[in-house]
Amino acid sequence: TLWHTLSLHDALPIFAPSKTKGGQSIIANDTHLMLALPSPWIIMHLECPTYRCAGVTLPGIPVITAGFNGTIAWGETMVMADSQDLFIEKIKRENDNLLYLFKGKWLQVKTRQETFKIKGEDPVTIPVFSTHHGPLLNSALQHLPMPPEMPVQPLPVNIPYGLSLSWIVKDGDVTLDAFYRLGRARSMKQARDAISGIHSIYLNIVYGDSQNIGWQVTGLYPVRKKGTGQFPSPGWTGEYEWDGFLPFSALPHSKNPASQYLCTANHRTVGKNYPVHLTSSWYNQERARRIDQVLSGKDDFTIEDVMNLQNDRYSMMAKKVQDILYHGRTGKLLRKAMDSMKPSHREYAEKALRMLQPGSFNCIMDTGSAGAALMGALYHSFTRAAFMDELGKEDSIQWESFIQASMTSFSATDQLLVYTDNSTFYDDISTPEVENKYDILARSLYQAWNLCREELGNDENEWEWGALHTYHWQHDIAKKTGLLKGYLNRGPFPAGGDVHTVNVAGFTWGKNFDVWMIPAMRMIVDFNSSEPLHIITTPEESGHPSSPHYDDMIPFFLEGRYQEIPLGSESSNRHYTFTMILTP
């Protein structure tokens, strides 16, 4: 759960002075995390003799991770870096010694004791075994409860193989100190120098002052002697060792580009032949292309324009699907497939085509849109039609594993729906015929129309995307126990957008329409404003259900509104309702 909560995708448009109406920079950021209650983010304004900054941070971290210090503003998106490697180790026991093989020699496995203090119980001490690659995971996997969609087999320590993890944090880390120095930066150079110390979190950081903008990829990227680290490597040969880390100067970066704007949205930000291997987990380009489309269209942006962009629901993916349905060769192939359908099925497929045609559906995934509801249903139906015959029904491990994988960067449905015409998955193995893409697409149109009728009623004029697709904030206690739902949970509320819109509202294609990923915070620093920092977190600032601040950000989120966060002491005193003063 923690992986999903902290490492999803994000969007970062930033504007150079020449792109804004007021002539000074605008820095924007929204981080897309799991829809969670309490919120993973908190808004914090932190002042002490050596530090003055406001923005967002994670509870318990005493520095601002994205924000504004009066001179420099910064935000971040995830790179999804390939920064960890698993090594298969040959291990054996001799008497009381645990050994591992490396380059023909049996070496001693290092052992240390870790003690965990547990409230109300005695401390628990466990041994941790490590090779030079990192800790052996055998014992951890042996006692780790695995969900059915991730059927990883435990590895007992007494088998002849171990699994070790290489990761830079095993040797210590200074990332928190780097964020502290970033919050104190008073120039672009000082900001980039601070960013160079962010080693263990792999980010696209955008930063700027009133007259400059910049982008910098962070983190220590291992230089591998062989391989890319995508699969566990033999640890005993020495062929796959790490040979240091890429220098900071080799990481992608930019300052004041000719385009006068920068954008990152977890998409591929470097060419395929870029000499540095950052990741194999780029997200699709649709959100970034939409941001680029908007940013390249004018040179007088205001903060209101940026707010509208962060709340934008136009889907480039829906437009691509629309092009396939209606244009040229693909449209003809689809109609040929529809001609062979049962008359009743063809009738629904034709109705779906009429609703999704360019004159009827503008590719904006608004809450009140019938076309958006049908497009969302089409994504859902196509996923099931293409993959369920091979992977099994909802209760199969294969299907659950596929659904889990589809929540990460690569989308097999995107690939089959838009980017290829040739795949064995198009054939429905439960029929004697050999189906192609357009047979499955025609079937999916019929199934999507039928799904909307069942869920939204027979009158398509009454269909609304927000009736199918909803935000529902559910507290972990209520989800796990079923208790206090009315007290702890909030929603459901109608949701627009989808996983491919700038205003992300991700749902799992093929499973259901429940929104699970949202912009957990939105931030804009407009250097043209007297109080530049505007921000919200979702759904709240307080984790106490009886607090008025438990859910008071939800209306702001739904309506696309922001809170102004002043940095000046007099303005701050008027703005805040509660102040905590810590004295030595």
Residue ranges: model-predicted function:
Residues 371-462:
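Charged, long alpha-helical assembly modules
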